[in-house]
Curated annotation (Swiss-Prot):
Naturally occurring in which organism (per UniProt): Bos taurus
Keyword Zinc-finger appears in the UniProt entry: yes
Region (Disordered): 178-255
Record function comment: Seems to function as a negative regulator of members of the IAP (inhibitor of apoptosis protein) family. Inhibits anti-caspase activity of BIRC4. Induces cleavage and inactivation of BIRC4 independent of caspase activation. Mediates TNF-alpha-induced apoptosis and is involved in apoptosis in trophoblast cells. May inhibit BIRC4 indirectly by activating the mitochondrial apoptosis pathway. After translocation to mitochondria, promotes translocation of BAX to mitochondria and cytochrome c release from mitochondria.
Biased composition (Polar residues): 229-245
GO CC entries: mitochondrion; nucleus
Protein name: XIAP-associated factor 1
Length: 297
């Protein structure tokens, strides 16, 4: 059959059946198989073929000896010292060190152009895909639930949800009498709970929080109601507060007055937290009220 193919016994090539006899006669006369690469070579070129094609040469990168005819494929596919490109910084790195290089290189951060966050290079591609999906969802009007954060109230030291913080702060400020937190560096006394103050108010009208809204309002209770004297011109009009200590009156300087308002103490009768200058005056009223209740009972 004219289209059938047969294998030549010398060069092992497939030849058409009708040309096989002529091909084998020519092949046996002029061609021989190379013992190294098993390729048919002309007899008079065999020596040159073996010296040029099968000569061992050293790889310039790994110094490994390879046949000269396979040097190109070795350098392109097999050599472990061949340069490859880092997927993060696009620099040329040796193949046997690229894993370690990319591990450290991938830990560097880059600014995400979509959300503005700093993201590590090794997860940047996945982050951008997720970030772009989130941006599309936001543009379509679909709200993404955000975890609610808690804020500490500096009046009652309770953790309040962020969406209720300002409402709680306004209410807590009114209940606590707008006492500002202690400054940094000064002793800090934990305030009593607003719930305890509310309970005291319901128990007795007399046992209410008498702390003033402003420090200057404490000046009037310590002035004698019968005194009609006025401070002469040119003198300091600030009224000095007096504190009772061991049964004696002691005048305090303006600086001491200011610091005294930052010190809070509890009333021994009703346990209300009050600034130190008003505590003694309040305790006297509490004692009188307690004694009057005892007589009634």
């Amino acid at each position: 059959m004219e289209g059938a193919l047969q294998v030549c016994r010398n060069c092992k090539r497939r030849v058409a059946s009708n040309h096989l006899g002529l091909h084998e006669a020519h092949c046996l006369m002029y061609l021989v198989l190379c013992p190294e690469c098993k390729e048919p070579v002309l007899q008079h070129e065999m020596e040159e073929h073996c010296q040029g094609g099968h000569q061992q040469v050293g790889c310039a990168m790994c110094q490994q000896s390879v046949p000269k005819h396979s040097l190109d494929s070795h350098e392109a596919q097999e050599c472990q010292e061949r340069p490859v490109e880092c997927q993060f910084c696009q620099l040329a790195v040796r193949l046997n060190k690229v894993d370690l290089h990319e591990h450290h290189c991938g830990q560097q951060t880059e600014l995400c152009p979509d959300c503005g966050q700093h993201v590590m290079l090794r997860v940047l591609a996945r982050h951008r895909e997720e970030c772009q999906r989130e941006q599309l969802r936001l543009q379509k009007g679909k709200s993404i639930p955000v975890p609610e954060s808690n804020i500490c109230c500096h009046y009652c030291n309770q953790m309040i949800p962020g969406n209720k913080y300002f409402h709680h702060l306004d209410r807590c400020r009114r209940v606590s009498g707008a006492v500002t937190p202690s400054p940094v560096g000064k002793p800090e006394i934990p305030p009593s709970s607003p719930l305890s103050w509310a309970a005291e108010d319901q128990t007795s009208k007399a046992e209410k929080d008498v702390r003033p809204k402003l420090k200057n309002r404490h000046r009037a209770p310590f002035l004698s109601e019968k005194s009609t004297r006025q401070a002469p011109r040119g003198t300091n009009k600030t009224t000095n507060l007096s504190l009772k200590s061991n049964g004696k009156l002691r005048a305090s300087s303006p600086v001491e007055d200011e610091t005294a308002y930052d010190i809070l103490r509890r009333c021994s009768q009703c346990d209300i937290l009050l600034p130190l200058p008003t505590l003694n005056h309040h305790q006297e009223k509490c004692r009188r009220l307690a004694s009057s209740k005892g007589k009634q009972v």
